[in-house]
């Protein structure tokens, strides 16, 4: 019966030697209402007076009590020094380190002092546990937890929600699936009102780990007994119901020993419950608890075995990553260089062994930069951004020189469209920079995840990082130059014969023709009414005549781009069509710039430029022709409006063609001059820079803590293998 628990304690000690708390040993948690006899039951199991006793609330902090069985011959225990203590039983607290207590009165006093230190001296309760280990030849190997008793009404310094606090504290301990619940209920209370059984069923509804203990059998009313309760006829408990007799307060005051109490308990049971005496009492409770603990440990063994195997595999892998001491430095260096270069290229290709799941990295991020970041940035560039009407008119006038232009010069279109195309260079260079940064990040990714062997040799790691960084740094200006040339190529020749550009011009011609027809249909009625009222040809009407409503609305508008209306023919004074006919438009963009004489006359009639000079020169300052002219806001003429509109449409059409070319060619250039070049030359560059006999000893110098890490991993692996062997022995020898 006692053979299994020492093995589990030994297993726990194996992990404690390496500073790990891996296995949760099954605990026996004692719960019950206040003054139900929980501490008395624990004292009976220990066999000594070591817990504070009294009326009211006494246990105000959880007490984790570990009972350790020792042989009667093993009396001398040392504290790690030459001097030790000579005792048959002793105790040790966690908070007092290696101090040993041979007087159990001192243990009880230390529990009271430690309780008051945290919880105060006025019935306060604290969830912080007290750890006590008791060594004795009179106990079996058990771990018990004594909890504060459940109460309803706060007293002393207890908060108003003391009932809820204690309930949460109890649930925290009994919710552990590896615990056995000892539900203590007094025999002089109704079993149906047991708070201990009620809270136990909340976490253990099947009753698979709940054992009921009935205390105070000797305090029942005269003429009554607990026969029905002990036999499970009132409330059945799956693991059983055990009755015990505790010492009374008078017995404690009279210094009655636990041994005498157990002897008197046996006599009482033989007298009152002779048929149940062999299945009740403190000794039977201890044996039952030990048996339940054994079965519970047996059920936990498969999980413990699995956890140990997983940890052993992890530490074995860690030890392998640390590697063995280097024998052939030349081969080791070449192997590490080759492995790093392979992992670097695999990370770009997406075939690396260690793939990130939390974020994009490597080739996936480069793809995201090309098609998401760079693509969206180019699409956000406005083809007409930074251009206004004044800029366009100024470019047109500067391109014509001193001569008035009959058509819009092509030079102005090229000048303006080149200005817009140049705006694509900055996001293209930024794309190169982002790809360069990602390739820098791949270095760190490979160092951390893919080639952990490099962590053994920090100097080699730093040298590899430096070589790859220099290689990337050398390729950066080459790639930037190529991207700059791609933009320069587009600027070098404006291809107005581009198929997409010709199609766009033809479509715009059709749109303008449609706009002319629509405007003519709207203006003919207004022109006819004006002829009847003024009797003057509309083309020669005085400038002072008010324009029709449509023209007035036009006059109020600002200098913005819109679809300017043009007439197809000008009506004569008699209502007929004038001599000015429409010239046919051509298929290229020059056809958009032609106009008819009637259109010019109508434009002059509709809007006269606002005079810039003062009406009375005598009253103003003298005009100096050498002064720089100041731009004056005025309404554009119909021709100026049309010229601006045509130029804007042409710029937008050609800009979209160039943007499409840049969006396609820049990623290709980056891949060829930066990414693929680095992939192809990385290994040869690393070998050429680092694979030298003069650098072997320096590069393959291990870090100072690597040997310590290797030793710790080996010790942990050895401890895990020992634990696995112990579990195998338990399974083969004791359980199956």
Curated annotation (Swiss-Prot):
Give residue numbers for the modification (N-acetylmethionine).
1
Which intervals of the chain are annotated as region G2 motif?
58-60
Tissue range of expression?
Answer: Expressed in the cerebellum and in several regions of the cerebrum and diencephalon. Strongly expressed in the cerebellar Purkinje cells and in the pontile giant neurons.
Outline the extent of the Dynamin-type G domain: 22-302
One GO CC term of this entry? Answer: presynaptic endocytic zone membrane
Q: Which residues carry this modification: Phosphoserine?
A: 529, 607, 616, 637
Effect on the protein of changing residue 616 to A:
Loss of activity and phosphorylation. Unable to rescue aberrant mitochondrial fission in PINK1 null mutant neurons
Which residue ranges does the record assign to the GED domain? 644-735
Q: Which CDD domains match?
A: DLP_1
Enzyme class, top EC level, equals hydrolase
Annotated stretches, region: C-terminal dimerization domain: 542-736
Q: Which family does it belong to?
A: Belongs to the TRAFAC class dynamin-like GTPase superfamily. Dynamin/Fzo/YdjA family.
Function of this protein? Functions in mitochondrial and peroxisomal division. Mediates membrane fission through oligomerization into membrane-associated tubular structures that wrap around the scission site to constrict and sever the mitochondrial membrane through a GTP hydrolysis-dependent mechanism. The specific recruitment at scission sites is mediated by membrane receptors like MFF, MIEF1 and MIEF2 for mitochondrial membranes.
This chain belongs to which protein, by name? Dynamin-1-like protein
Q: Which organism is it from?
A: Mus musculus
